[in-house]
Design a protein with these regions (language model features):
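Gly/Gly-Pro- and Ser/Thr-rich, intrinsically disordered tail segments characteristic of DNA damage-repair
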Residues: 1-171
């Protein structure tokens, strides 16, 4: 990593819940963890698109936003689960409340992503340095997993763009 003097000033985390809709469904129905599954569309009429998929479906080449018929050609045993948006909103709120334990500067972006500016609260966890920021990121990841069953990618940087790139890289 290249040192930049801006890194001494701000510490931003980008938190991204992995395969959020599919992950919530797998938490609620653990039997879905071991089969290719996706959230989306109407399985009876065979219309609609894939909103999210688990890692097993991803290995078959199933992509977010592709049609159900296309996904089923790639993965005939794909289990399609209808979306439960109210449940996803509850999980999102729970996760954002976890973030508030670390900073009051939480900026949600959609239902499954948030930026956290931890600069002002780092002294509560150690020094104001990159190692402490990584420690906080790990603690948030572990807390979210323990309390919700969901996995989270977290990028750490001195600005939003690089923090987002970091969370994408950590997936």
């Amino acid at each position: 990593m290249v040192y930049n003097s801006h890194m001494d000033k701000r510490f931003i985390l980008h938190c991204d819940l992995n395969g959020f809709f599919a992950s919530v469904e797998c938490v609620l129905k653990p039997e879905l963890k071991n089969v290719p599954m996706a959230v989306g569309g109407d399985k009876e009429t065979r219309h609609g698109i894939i909103l999210a998929k688990n890692e097993i479906a991803k290995k078959y080449g199933v992509k977010t936003a592709e049609t159900l018929s296309s996904a089923r050609k790639k993965c005939p045993d794909l289990v399609i689960v209808p979306p439960h948006h109210g449940v996803y909103h509850k999980y999102s709120k729970t996760v954002n409340l976890i973030y508030l334990r670390y900073t009051d500067l939480v900026e949600p972006f959609g239902i499954d992503e948030s930026w956290l500016d931890i600069t002002g609260s780092m002294h509560l966890f150690g020094k104001k340095d990159y190692e402490t920021a990584k420690k906080i990121a790990d603690e948030i990841r572990n807390t979210v997993k323990k309390e919700t069953g969901l996995t989270l990618s977290v990028g750490v940087s001195y600005n939003k763009v690089f923090a987002k790139l970091g969370s994408d890289y950590k997936k």
